[in-house]
A protein has these predicted regions:
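Hard-cation-handling environments
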Residues: 208-332, 337-338, 345-348, 352-359, ...
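Conserved small/polar residues in nucleotide/adenosyl-binding loops
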Residues: 534-541
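Short, intrinsically disordered, charge-balanced linker/junction segments flanking boundaries
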Residues: 6-7, 520-533
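Histidine-centered catalytic/metal-coordination loop motif
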Residues: 509
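His/Asp/Glu-rich metal-coordinating catalytic cores
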Residues: 2-73, 78-290, 309-323, 342-346
Length: 541
């Protein structure tokens, strides 16, 4: 870790997550004696993180500077932007600011974690939270979830504009378009630094409007006039949920919901008025058998093939209430998150094996919620920042986004393709990376947060590849004599019934070692264990 010089007239901008990766979005802005945090997301574990449930950012820098933190400001309610909040609030109870739906979804998460004392604050677009040295403004955005916002941080050095996740959708489902007028006003005042998402920076053109999905769903529902329809999508894609409900209403189908997160989101979004479900249309999952196949639509989690999701359990015949049958139409209305392709493929194959028709990976049933190249260019032209730092994406995405900015005329020395933990110091005249802060992954395994480290992951990997052998032996504490055993328990190593000679040979080796230790009057458990371990290593050689 390089230490950076203390300069209270410089604004420090640091990412604790979201750079060189998908997910775990978290940005820290520090000015004088104040810190604000934008988003606090989680990500999913990769293939090497065996047994890990979720990954959250390392917040040791925030814990060290907790007295400076004025709040966490949420751009929208997706898991990669709010998923780490319960774990953070257990360590630092600081105010949370977000739009109504974002706060509603956060409340559900905090309730699951039994956190009752959170300081939650609902804001509206164009609201400004005034601090001593910064003012934080929420600005209406378009994304795949309602109430998405960008954030403008006003300082006496200039404005820092953080886009959050966005797309430029001129025909959004809820009719709420991006507040381009306010962005232009900020541009006239002068934007010092732009942080813009890079998720689709590799993709040419513009992202299609969410409304185009409606036509694709309409066509599939019409063709499946005699089939039961099951639609899997992201629970938090509320605009998509609304379109599925609208299509179901058009074809006189009832709607049931499966999957814990889907049930929670539908309940919150309906209660807050973001999801419009006609009276008597939503039915209990237990009641779907009371209706003919062509009278019901099931909306479910599992669009990413998550092993414990509702769709995955249906595919493996482990769902308690839904059994896939021949003739079912399964619509997977989502693109795979990088790394999930194998999981999704496994689920799709299982669904086909059960006789279902599966529609997936088609452009007319899913559109992205992230800006492509032409929208990113437009954002740069609207904001006209002095400095630029691409955010939210893997390295190649950040790099391509930086090249787009350079093509638009921004000097290369004003563009910063940073890594997580880099400290960008900036004022009205200059910007420079001056050091780093501690960052990394904190692995959540069940109730344990940060308990799983590299050594534990290494051991889990070895167990998964090589199996396990346990030697059970009872030894007298007084004189070191063997009282019982040795017995050998093996899992994932060899099939014992077909390897009796091998196991008998191993027992004989262990007996010889124990006999030698007994003759030498060795009683210490640690020494005995090492003798057996080194004997095993020697046998391997």
């Amino acid at each position: 870790m390089r230490l950076f010089r203390k300069n209270t007239n410089k604004i420090k901008v640091m990412a604790l997550g979201g750079l060189n990766e998908i997910g775990k979005n978290m940005t820290v802005i520090e000015y004088k004696d104040e810190i604000i945090v934008i988003d606090a997301g989680m990500s999913f574990p990769d293939d090497e993180m065996l047994g890990v449930d979720v990954v959250i950012p390392d917040i040791s820098y925030l814990i060290k500077n907790k007295d400076k933190i004025k709040g966490i400001f949420i751009t929208h309610g997706h898991e990669d932007h709010i998923g780490a909040l319960p774990y953070i609030l257990k360590k630092i109870n600081i105010p949370i600011y977000g739009a109504k739906l974002s706060i509603g979804l956060i409340q559900v998460k905090l309730k699951e974690h039994k956190i009752n004392n959170a300081k939650l604050n609902v804001v509206s677009p164009r609201d400004i939270i005034k601090l001593s040295h910064m003012e934080v403004e929420f600005i209406k955005n378009n994304h795949s979830i309602p109430d998405a916002c960008s954030i403008a941080v006003h300082t006496d050095q200039g404005i820092i504009y953080h886009t959050g996740d966005f797309k430029i959708d001129l025909t959004p489902i809820d009719g709420e378009v991006m507040d381009i007028h306010r962005i232009c006003e900020l541009s006239k005042k002068g934007v010092l630094l732009l942080l813009a998402e890079s998720t689709n920076a590799e993709q040419p053109g513009s992202t299609m409007s969410e409304k185009t999905v409606g036509a694709g769903l309409d066509d599939l529902f019409r063709k499946a006039s005699n089939s039961r329809i099951i639609v899997a999508t992201f629970a938090s894609n509320i605009h998509r949920l609304q379109q599925i409900i609208n299509t179901a209403e058009k074809f006189n189908r009832k709607v049931a919901v499966s999957g814990r997160s889907m049930v929670n989101v539908v309940a919150v979004a309906t209660e807050l008025g973001y999801l419009n479900i006609p009276d008597n249309m939503l039915i209990d999952l237990n009641d779907i058998s009371k209706y003919e196949d062509n009278e019901v639509v099931l909306i479910t989690t599992g669009s990413q093939g998550e092993p414990m999701s509702a769709l995955a359990r249906m595919a493996s015949a482990e769902h308690k209430k839904v059994e896939i049958k021949r003739g079912d139409l399964i619509i997977i209305s989502a693109h795979p998150i990088p790394g999930n392709e194998k999981l999704i493929s496994k689920v799709i194959n299982s669904l086909f094996e059960k006789g279902a028709e599966v529609v997936y990976d088609e452009s007319d049933i899913h559109v992205s919620g992230h800006a492509k190249q032409e929208e990113l260019k437009l954002m740069h032209r609207l904001v006209r920042p002095k400095f630029f730092m691409p955010a939210h994406g893997e390295y190649r995405m950040l790099k391509i986004h930086a090249e787009l900015a350079e093509e638009l005329g921004m000097p290369s020395q004003n563009i910063f393709v940073n890594k997580t933990g880099d400290v960008l110091e900036i004022d009205r005249n200059s910007a420079k990376v001056t050091g780093t802060i501690p960052t990394g992954n904190v692995l959540v395994d069940g109730l344990g947060v940060g308990d799983v480290g590299n050594i534990v992951l290494r051991d889990r990997k070895h167990l998964s590849e090589d199996g396990l052998m346990i030697v059970v032996v009872t030894i007298s504490k007084e004189d070191g004599r063997v009282l019982a055993g040795p017995d050998i328990i093996s899992r994932g190593f060899v099939y014992v019934r077909e390897s009796e000679d091998l196991m008998d040979g191993a027992k004989n080796v262990i007996k010889d070692v124990l006999r030698d230790c007994e003759d030498r009057n060795i009683k210490e458990w640690a020494y005995l264990k090492n003798c057996l371990l080194y004997t095993s290593d020697a046998a391997d050689e």
